[in-house]
């Protein structure tokens, strides 16, 4: 039931909310790591862009050694927080970080595969959160496939509109 948590004892509710918060922080740190990696990979191309050239990494405002150190600390922190929750969550988190890093390195250059990859990233985030909830309450509960599919199709819809808008705007300029 959707409102199953209302009937739980207070210590289980606190455990659930704590695990959800830890998972949230873990995914935030993982996403932050990926953004840094992506900016680092794109730094040379961003230097020539009128807006992106002002980014700290593209404009060389941050030394490369510091970028590497901070990104390593963020990645280790993300995985460390994930380890607190459950093995199934850390598995999802590692797949997410790996696939989004692969996106930054290769996939973003492949038409349509790039938006599918981003949509899968959103699905992994939702699935990771659902895994935390299930593991905190009752491991016999199954995560709804509809939750994952609706997230995937909704993100594909939004990403397709964004892509169409980018293509249309590029043709106008």
Residue positions per predicted region:
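Hydrophobic alpha-helical transmembrane segments
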Residues: 5-7, 77-85, 102-106, 129-132
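Residue-level signal for inorganic ion chemistry
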Residues: 1-2, 42, 63, 114
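Multi-pass membrane catalytic core of lipid/isoprenoid biosynthesis enzymes
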Residues: 43, 48-93, 141-152, 156
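Interhelical loop and helix-boundary elements at the membrane-water interface
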Residues: 53-67, 102-120, 164-173
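C-terminal membrane-associated helical module and adjoining short loops/tails
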Residues: 105, 123, 128-173
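Acidic (Asp/Glu-rich) catalytic motifs at the cytosolic membrane interface
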Residues: 27-58, 113, 161-168
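Membrane-embedded alpha-helical segments that form the functional core of polytopic membrane enzymes
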Residues: 2, 6-41, 88-103
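Residue-level recognition of pore/gate-forming positions within transmembrane alpha-helices
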Residues: 27, 74-76, 96-100, 118, ...
């Amino acid at each position: 039931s959707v409102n199953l948590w209302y009937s739980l004892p207070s210590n289980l509710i606190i455990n659930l909310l704590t695990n959800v918060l830890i998972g949230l922080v873990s995914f935030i740190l993982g996403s932050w790591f990926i953004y840094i990696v992506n900016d680092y990979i794109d730094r040379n191309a961003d230097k020539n862009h009128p807006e992106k050239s002002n980014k700290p990494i593209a404009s060389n405002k941050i030394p490369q050694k510091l970028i590497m150190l901070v990104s390593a600390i963020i990645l280790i922190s993300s995985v460390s927080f994930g380890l607190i929750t459950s093995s199934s969550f850390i598995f999802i988190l590692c797949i997410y970080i790996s696939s989004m890093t692969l996106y930054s390195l290769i996939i973003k250059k492949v038409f349509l595969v790039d938006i599918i990859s981003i949509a899968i990233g959103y699905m992994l985030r939702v699935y990771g959160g659902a895994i935390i909830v299930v593991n905190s309450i009752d491991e016999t509960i199954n995560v709804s496939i509809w939750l994952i599919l609706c997230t995937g199709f909704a993100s594909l819809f939004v990403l397709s509109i964004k892509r169409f808008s980018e293509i249309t705007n590029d043709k106008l300029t």
